[in-house]
Amino acid sequence: MSGTVAERREAKIASIVDVAWELAREHGIAGISLHALAREVGMRQPSLYEYFDSKYALYDAMFADGNRQLLERFNALQLPRDARAALKKYLKAYVSFAMEDPARCELLFQRHIPGFAPSPESYALAEAALGGAVKLMHEAGVVDQGDIDCVVAMTAGLMDAQMSNDPGGNRWTRHLNRLVDLLIDDAITRSIRT
């Protein structure tokens, strides 16, 4: 495939994914209809299969796109030198990114699509995003896998509680820094004892 043809194909895929996100914002991530998507992008539904061999392939492209957006957000961060402050800023960016777009949050951080699992290539992007947080946790003194799991679970729990009970607000997410401090202090204290 020549560069021009490949570039046009990639541009078409990107535009289809953009429209799929618009539909997901309107109908929820599980509410995307391939028929409606085809209509919105000006093609017949069977023509979508030239770009995505299944609805799961579309979700996979969206999963990759969302995680690329997240990684771009992280790459733009100016992190402070202090490890604890850097971790808080990184996790705040994670939470803010999730709260900005409920449909994207559903696909990237929750399990709203029965049977969907991202491809290894797409999942590697999610692992890279989480890997940045884990690196900062290590620098802040959180090195035990159980302690890392607690920070991840706490962050995800705040996102879920916020999205479910106070979308657009900050009732739960405003406690992020306080809970990060508690978990870091606990992890450091327990590591000193052992």
Where are these regions (language model features)?
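Short hydrophobic clusters on alpha-helical segments that form packing/core surfaces
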Residues: 16-24, 66, 70, 94, ...
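Amphipathic alpha-helical segments used for helix-helix packing
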Residues: 99-117, 160-166
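Alpha-helical DNA-contacting segments of helix-turn-helix folds
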Residues: 59-66, 108, 125
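Hydrophobic alpha-helical connector segments
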Residues: 61, 75-103, 126-128, 148-151
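N-terminal intrinsically disordered/low-complexity leader segments
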Residues: 1-11, 191-194
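Amphipathic alpha-helical packing segments from all-alpha helical-bundle domains
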Residues: 71, 97, 115-152, 174-182
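Amphipathic C-terminal alpha-helical segment
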Residues: 152-170, 184-193
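Helix-turn-helix
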Residues: 15, 19, 23-57, 61
